[in-house]
Amino acid sequence: MSLQRTTDEVLQLASNYFKVPREQLGPDDDFFKKLGINSLQALDLLTRLEQHFHIELPDYELQGVSDFRTLAERIQSRL
């Protein structure tokens, strides 16, 4: 799977789960701000992404990650 496809799937899943139109989300957007979520909701999103991609993302790999592109890169590295 390409990084572009991984990024697209991350954006689509976030869009569906948080009921934000997909066209309002971009790879470089801060997901906390763009989705209007808190850290617990972000953790829920990460859990859903792990299930969707059948991976496990260690906490240390996610520290400081707040944009969709970097999140997709971390996921891609585990595929």
List PLM regions with ranges:
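Phosphopantetheine-dependent thiolation modules in NRPS/PKS and related acyl-activating systems
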Residues: 2-37, 46, 51-79
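Two-component histidine kinase catalytic core, primarily the HATPase_c
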Residues: 41
